[in-house]
């Protein structure tokens, strides 16, 4: 969010892994972080089989909570994000988390060369569903993971 005297855009990010219901904890955390962005919000919780279940919405965290309640999400590990739009309009498709084949990602910041990266990744066969720079990061890390077979090396290489 932009501060009263300008400043830089910010977002709220939360992660959880433990024994309790991750969705409830993520939503509670996002409510506390909502001042950092209220254009859109989203969560991804990994169910008992490891499958990611993602819920996104435009607007405030309470909208997300209502949407998530309809899905009856159950899992003990997940990530959440509340967004102040920097790349892409405040629309559901631009809400985080973003996914690429092997990973799900939230991000706070601006990727200056995302236009060039997007063209490169599209040439490599990646399809984009959002207008965000974060989706570029997700696809780039995925591409490097496929090349290097190490998540840590892939992140550093990206």
PLM feature spans:
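Conserved short alpha-helical segments that host acidic/polar catalytic motifs at enzyme active sites
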Residues: 2-158
């Amino acid at each position: 969010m932009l501060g009263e005297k300008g400043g830089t855009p910010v977002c709220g990010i939360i992660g959880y892994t433990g024994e309790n219901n991750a969705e409830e904890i993520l939503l509670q955390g996002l409510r506390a972080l909502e001042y950092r962005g209220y254009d859109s919000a989203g969560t991804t919780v990994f169910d008992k089989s490891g499958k990611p279940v993602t819920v996104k919405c435009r607007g405030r965290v309470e909208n997300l909570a209502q949407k998530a309640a309809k899905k009856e999400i159950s899992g003990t590990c997940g990530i959440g994000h509340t967004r102040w739009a920097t790349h892409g309009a405040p629309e559901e498709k631009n809400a985080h988390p973003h996914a690429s084949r092997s990973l799900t990602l939230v991000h706070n910041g601006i990727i200056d060369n995302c236009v060039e990266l997007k063209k490169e990744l599209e040439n490599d066969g990646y399809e984009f569903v959002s207008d965000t720079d974060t989706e570029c990061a997700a696809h780039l890390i995925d591409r490097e993971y496929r090349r290097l077979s190490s998540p840590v090396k892939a992140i550093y290489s990206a």
